[in-house]
């Protein structure tokens, strides 16, 4: 039993419903939690759509300050978007999978209420921490933009299918130069996402490691590189590159930059705290 469940007084429902079925689940779960005596906050846009009383509306930032648990209803994309914001508030998240793969969303919607009851009323869960990446754009010795990423930060040209030349430094030491369509810098969580499709290695979630995976490199010898998770990665660009470059964080946030800028990527100070169901396995002897 995890005694953390006793601290769950205010629970938030977050996620962006893609259809009426998902929207109805928000509504049903809202009433289910209210009937059990919890204070319930609902992400603002969803709460307005459901015409819930004003006191239950909250932005993600307000949820971070007020809730002790966030339930994400949707697929991994919903989890990624909410995790980037809520991680800095140290609030744990648990997901009900209404998407496709559900790598980060544990709960089966068909058994959602019984599984949530086990978590919320009997503490049958464990907490897993996963680190995020922080991407920063340096321009004329000043940081002009920044974003977190749960899965990966991808350096690429804004123009589709256009090669770029860049130099990678690890802990301020030159590592390699490359000419390719871009570079994927991935966490262990993201190693089974975009990084995997580019030939990157699969890393177990508890590894303290970062993978650097080239995207269509113009060479026969370029291979993915795995470095220590506490490494500080800097990428500098040749002047002749296209003037429009981007860092994409989890394919949801975009940081534009130019070849004169420097991209810095390292482990974020914030962590994603995921609640997972405890699975009891009975073996026959």
Swiss-Prot record:
One annotated GO molecular function: NAD binding
Reaction catalyzed: NAD(+) + ATP = ADP + NADP(+) + H(+)
Subcellular location: Cytoplasm
UniProt protein name: NAD kinase
EC number: 2.7.1.23
GO CC terms in record: cytoplasm
Function (record text): Involved in the regulation of the intracellular balance of NAD and NADP, and is a key enzyme in the biosynthesis of NADP. Catalyzes specifically the phosphorylation on 2'-hydroxyl of the adenosine moiety of NAD to yield NADP.
InterPro entries referenced in this protein's UniProt entry, alphabetically: ATP-NAD_kinase_N, ATP-NAD_kinase_PpnK-typ_C, NAD/diacylglycerol_kinase_sf, NADK
GO biological process, one term: NADP biosynthetic process
Main location (coarse class): cytoplasm
One Pfam family it belongs to: NAD_kinase_C
Ligand binding (NAD(+)): 76-77, 151-152, 162, 179, 181, 192-197, 252
Active site: 76 (proton acceptor)
Named cofactor requirement(s): a divalent metal cation
Highest rank taxon of the organism: Bacteria
SUPFAM superfamilies reported for this sequence: NAD kinase/diacylglycerol kinase-like (SSF111331)
Similarity comment: family membership: Belongs to the NAD kinase family.
Keywords: ATP-binding, Cytoplasm, Kinase, NAD, NADP, Nucleotide-binding, Transferase
């Amino acid at each position: 039993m995890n005694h953390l469940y006793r601290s769950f007084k205010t629970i938030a429902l977050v996620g962006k419903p893609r259809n009426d079925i998902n929207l109805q689940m928000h509504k049903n779960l809202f009433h289910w939690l209210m009937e059990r005596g919890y204070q319930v906050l609902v992400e603002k846009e969803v709460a307005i759509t459901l015409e819930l009383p004003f006191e239950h509306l909250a932005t993600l930032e307000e949820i971070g300050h007020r809730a002790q648990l966030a339930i994400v209803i949707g697929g991994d994309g919903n989890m990624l978007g909410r995790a980037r914001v809520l991680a800095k508030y140290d609030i744990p998240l648990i997901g009900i999978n209404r998407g496709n793969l559900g790598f980060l969303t544990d709960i089966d919607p068909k058994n959602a209420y019984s599984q949530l009851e086990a978590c919320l009323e009997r503490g049958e869960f464990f907490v897993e921490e996963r680190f995020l990446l922080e991407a920063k754009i340096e321009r004329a010795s000043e940081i002009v933009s920044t974003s977190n990423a749960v899965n990966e930060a991808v350096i690429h040209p804004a123009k589709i299918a256009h090669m770029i030349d860049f130099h990678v430094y690890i802990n301020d030491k030159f590592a390699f130069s490359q000419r390719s369509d871009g570079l994927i810098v991935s966490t262990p969580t993201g190693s089974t996402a975009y990084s995997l499709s580019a030939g990157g290695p699969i890393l177990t979630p508890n590894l303290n490691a970062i993978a650097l995976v080239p995207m269509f490199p113009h060479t026969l010898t370029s291979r993915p590189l795995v470095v220590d998770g506490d490494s500080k990665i800097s990428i500098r660009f040749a002047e002749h590159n296209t003037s429009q470059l981007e860092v994409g964080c989890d394919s949801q946030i975009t940081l534009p930059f130019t070849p004169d800028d420097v991209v810095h990527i390292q482990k974020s100070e914030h962590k994603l705290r995921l609640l997972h169901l405890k699975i009891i396995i009975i073996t026959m002897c």
